[in-house]
């Protein structure tokens, strides 16, 4: 897997620092919002052609590692 910084960009000058797919203005959150609504990954990629399938899958893998981490309680506590 690529380093997360190759996939996720956080820049205060871009969308007020909201995490976006690197090289785009597409918020990472939009991927999860699509999936939560039952919209397929392929449809998300159609809606946001600037996001590569590899980067979308990598974000899902990163999220999977975070939620399956032994440190999930600490991570969750610091974000709420």
For the regions a language model picked out, list residue spans one by one.
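Surface-exposed beta-strand edges and their flanking turn/coil or helix-capping segments
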Residues: 19-22, 35-36, 41, 73-75
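Amphipathic, hydrophobic secondary-structure cores in small proteins
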Residues: 27-61
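Intrinsically disordered, low-complexity and often Lys/Arg-enriched segments
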Residues: 1-4, 75-80
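C-terminal structural segments of small proteins and small subunits
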Residues: 54-77
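N-terminal first-folded block
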Residues: 1-25
